[in-house]
């Protein structure tokens, strides 16, 4: 089950809703691959062609943040493993400054998003609240 969060900066007016996790649609590796961009789907399919015993250890819908300009994106994270070796893992480039974005760990039990900063004012005084469960 996925979780929806509302984040709000305590220093400025920034707020945004974000989704984290997976729902019932993502019950197979194939369904997870379909949740990525068309370009990413092509890359993944080429990498896994003919492979067996594939394991998905992705986070599902995740929050990525740029460590340079603090832009946020909410995209599907996929990590595919075969025999304890990572074959593919989602990487996101910042749409503003082209820096590789960092995957921010979310603790659904504690309602925290580790290391999140406000993309507007760069403050780390960001409030995180659960606003829905989705499937």
Question: What residue spans do the PLM features occupy?
Answer:
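Acidic, low-complexity intrinsically disordered segments
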Residues: 47-82
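Short cysteine-rich clusters marking metal-coordination/redox-active sites
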Residues: 9-12, 66-69, 94-97, 118-121
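Short functional micro-motifs and their immediate structural scaffolds
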Residues: 14-17, 71-74, 99-104, 125-127
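His-enriched metal-coordination microenvironments in redox/metal-binding proteins
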Residues: 1-6, 17, 133-135
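N-terminal cysteine/histidine-rich coordination modules
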Residues: 1, 13-47
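Exposed, interaction-prone assembly regions rather than primary DNA-binding/catalytic cores
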Residues: 121-131
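Short linker/helix segments within small regulatory modules
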Residues: 25, 52-60, 82-88, 105-117, ...
């Amino acid at each position: 089950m996925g979780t929806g969060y509302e984040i709000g900066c305590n220093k400025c007016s920034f707020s945004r809703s974000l989704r984290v996790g997976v729902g019932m649609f993502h019950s197979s590796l194939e369904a997870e691959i379909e949740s990525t961009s068309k370009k990413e789907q092509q890359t993944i399919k080429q990498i896994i062609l003919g492979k067996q015993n594939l394991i998905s250890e992705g986070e599902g819908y995740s929050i990525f943040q740029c460590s340079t300009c603090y832009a946020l994106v909410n995209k599907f994270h996929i990590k595919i493993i075969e025999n304890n070796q990572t074959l593919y893992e989602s990487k996101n480039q910042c749409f503003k400054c082209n820096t590789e974005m960092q995957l921010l760990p979310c603790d659904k039990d504690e309602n925290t998003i580790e290391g999140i900063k406000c993309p507007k004012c760069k403050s780390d005084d960001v409030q995180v609240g659960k606003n829905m469960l989705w499937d």
